[in-house]
Amino acid sequence: TRVRSSAASDVYKRQIITCPCFVGMYFLAEKIAALIYNAPGAADAIQTMSVGILLLGLHQISTGILQGLGRTSIPVINMILAAAVKVFLSWTLTAIPTLGIKGAAMATVVDFGLAAVLNMIFIYKYTGFALSFSGVFKPAVSAAAMGAAVYGVITLAVSWGAWAILAAIAVAVPVYGGVLLAVGGMGKDDLESLPFIGHRLLAAGQKLGYFR
């Protein structure tokens, strides 16, 4: 149906953005912790929170889909339930000495994930749409290639400090975009829907002969 197709398209476009953000934050966690917080030991918590990027993205887009279907109360209820679980887990996990602040990060990830899963259950109920492996394969492969490139950069530039982050980002963006285009993970419609840079990327692709 049209609603199911629209939901699938919206979720896919969100994954195009969240997959590389998750991978980038995971591999750059130690650098970010040292630069922003002056606390390299917080890297584990940041890596844990990086998973939340994927789940938060899914939660946000699934909330929008349910609101578009006129089921505005459902995501609110799901968010309240997930928040209650987060409070319990935060209280429990942070009390474990071996976890500490990482326990709070884990509780937040569960919060995002539970709210997203509950939303997706209702989306399936009303539209028949469900997440599939094929729907995340291309962004995941592209993000994995990007992750390998980022890891290589931060390994070689280990003594560069903050510049290592900038170097990694400078390499990550073209690698992710190039692989995503190479595997057919982004079409003209996908590019046009991206805010701010979509039309510019499409114009560049047309000049290079990738898009007609």
Where are these predicted regions, by residue range?
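Membrane-interface junctions at transmembrane-helix termini in multi-pass inner-membrane proteins
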Residues: 47, 51-81, 91-92
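Interfacial segments at transmembrane-helix termini and the short loops linking adjacent helices
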Residues: 25-54
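Alpha-helical transmembrane segments
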Residues: 62-70, 120-135, 186-189
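Membrane-interface helix-loop junctions in multi-pass transport and translocation proteins
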Residues: 70-76, 83-121, 148, 152-173, ...
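Single conserved hydrophobic/aromatic residue that forms the stacking wall/gate
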Residues: 1-8, 12
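Membrane-proximal transmembrane or re-entrant/amphipathic helices at the cytosolic face
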Residues: 151-212
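Hydrophobic alpha-helical transmembrane bundles that constitute the permease/transmembrane domains
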Residues: 10-13, 19, 54-61, 80-88, ...
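Short helix-capping/hinge motifs at transmembrane helix termini and TM-loop junctions
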Residues: 28-33, 37-39, 94-98, 127, ...
